[in-house]
Amino acid sequence: MERQDLAHSPAAAMAARRALELAGASLADIGAFDLYSCFPIAVFNICDELGLAPDDPRRLTLTGGLPFFGGAGNNYSMHAIAEIAARVRADPGSFGLVGANGGIMSKYSVGVYSATPCIE
């Protein structure tokens, strides 16, 4: 694997921006986040790429993060998706974002969730 800077993952930012675009939302529209947190660098990486402050009042996790909840691999993210789904159902029109890292910050998936269907 070759990257110009191992501390950054432009593909993660591209995935997040594209998911937001497809959902018709912006980062400011997101009411709840859960960012995959195997290690602090994974969280700081996506925060840096998106311009999201680590102390954002919306918090960066709903579950407490991988070290405290879940298991290895993206199984943790299934718990995050379930929690985001509960949150957006309780607040129709709101958006939630789940970011999931795989590999060595070389694969990143993003889901933007809402209880309200997208209007195309």
PLM segments and residue spans:
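Phosphate/pyrophosphate-binding loops at sites that engage ATP/ADP/AMP, CoA/4′-phosphopantetheine
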Residues: 15-29, 53
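Active-site pocket-shaping loop/turn-to-helix segments
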Residues: 1-18, 69-79, 83
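Accessory "access/gating" subregions that flank catalytic or transport cores
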Residues: 34-48
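Conserved beta-strand-centric core segments of catalytic alpha/beta enzyme folds
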Residues: 41-42, 69-120
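Flexible glycine/proline-rich, aromatic-decorated loop/lid segments
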Residues: 44-66
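Beta-strand segments within the central parallel beta-sheet cores of soluble alpha/beta enzyme folds
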Residues: 27-35, 56-64, 92-101
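Short secondary-structure boundary/capping segments
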Residues: 3-7, 48-51, 111-114
